[in-house]
Amino acid sequence: MTASPRAFDEFYREYGYEIKSEDIVDGGSYHSNSVVLTEKYKDYMDFTQKYVAKTVRMLTDIVHSYGKEAMMFLGDSWIGTEIFGEHFKELNLDALVGSVGGGVTVRMLSDVEGVRYKEGRFLPYFFPDTFFEGNEDNAVAELNRNWITARRAMMRNPLDRIGFGGYLSLAAKFPKFINRAAEICDEFRYIYDTVKTQTPRNFAKVAVLNSWGKIRSWMCNMTAHELWYQQSYSYQGIYEALSGLPVEVSFINFDDVKNGKLKDYDVVINAGDAGTAWSGGENWLDEKVVTEIRKFVYNGGGFIGVGEPTAVQYNGKFFQLSDVLGVDKECGISLGEDKYNIEKHSEHFITKGIKFPVDYGEDKKNIFALDGTNVIDIAFSDRFIRKVNVGEVKMATSVYGKGRSFYITGLPYSAENAKLLYRAILWTGNKENLDEKSYCENPLTEAHFYGDRFAVTNNTDKKQTTVFYDIDGNAQTLELKPY
């Protein structure tokens, strides 16, 4: 965020109260994406967006006066040009382009409204760190990895154009790379021509709940463009999985919850570390928030928690919706309360076709199940064997009124975890009857339905066999070539 004395003065005149440097510095956090938003910071962001939109509009008008198009590159910093903000359309841009790190960044671009077309720059960039003598096979492998993750998202909502960046003279020395890039371009054109004319079928409406909501759509738990961080990859996998699943995805904040928006969704996901914007911090102390979500689930909605959902220590609980989730975290405060629910029941609709052990990434410790919760997976220490107050729950389900919840300690991206998340969405959303509709049993393959045709993809570099179910549940075995 930017700041200046003039901006502070104009903010005061418009909003009627003062903003100070400390409101931006925020004790040294500088209001990074992971910091829980304050109302004052929201106002200042809106103020900045309006100013930038007015300024950029002058520039785009100049560009258009010369008969040219105005395109913005979505980089690591875009102060005031929030692509999912209320004022983005006022910039009057023609196009948006950004780097593609996988499915999440595809959707971060392709879901934007207010421009005529969106473009993705694929990896690897044509730079000497990749395009040096003897490294062609690695360059092709990186291209394939990037395309396979991006393609999952393209099957749901494709970009309008794809390209590369860097020095063409370097890429020209790698004929295998050029040939593979040409194949990918042909495949992209076919996907685009199909998906842009026929909306893919979605089987559930999912809302991701955090402090930011829509303005940080597809940017949750992310630093820059899908850079890997040990502290965030266990959450990042949720959004990578969602980017290519047959579900409609929205991003909502706590004001949306209080304003009755939950009725528009089948399942709500809350994921993140305690105290962060992604989990929600002290928003979970708002009685209206927890009441609205309890009511939503009790009446048949689904709730999925990952990591430390609804987390803030208060009133003897760490997970404020532990009654809905069926689990809580022992923080050393309730050790005197015996915990007997440690029996594992791994067979469940959610885990059908899923291989154990499940990859939980960085995981979470000291999660315990409340009485009545169904424990799907739990880990025990070999230091002490007993029947009470032992074990750490990894995965669990719970029933709350007519609704259901699912908890998991972490969900890094993999084909198996994407399938697990999809099945969790169907189960919590009371949609098990849609299980074998446009569906592949082999998690390395996926199916998409477009009204009059299906697409079945192989997301690996090896041949795959899968049982495929059409929209009516009819099964057939398919042999799929690599990619």
Regions found by a protein language model. Give the residues of each.
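Extracellular ligand-binding/catalytic regions of CAZymes and related secreted enzymes
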Residues: 146-149, 158, 166-205, 241-244, ...
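Hydrophobic faces of well-ordered beta-strands that scaffold small-molecule active sites
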Residues: 70-73, 94-98, 118-124, 160-164
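The substrate-binding groove and active-site-proximal loops of carbohydrate-active enzymes
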Residues: 36-53, 91-100, 130-141, 165-168, ...
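Aromatic-Pro/Gly-enriched surface loop or interdomain linker
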Residues: 151, 157, 179-265, 450-451
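Acidic (Asp/Glu)-rich catalytic clusters
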Residues: 87-88, 106-118, 154-158
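Active-site clefts of carbohydrate-active enzymes
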Residues: 34, 111-141, 170-174, 214-217
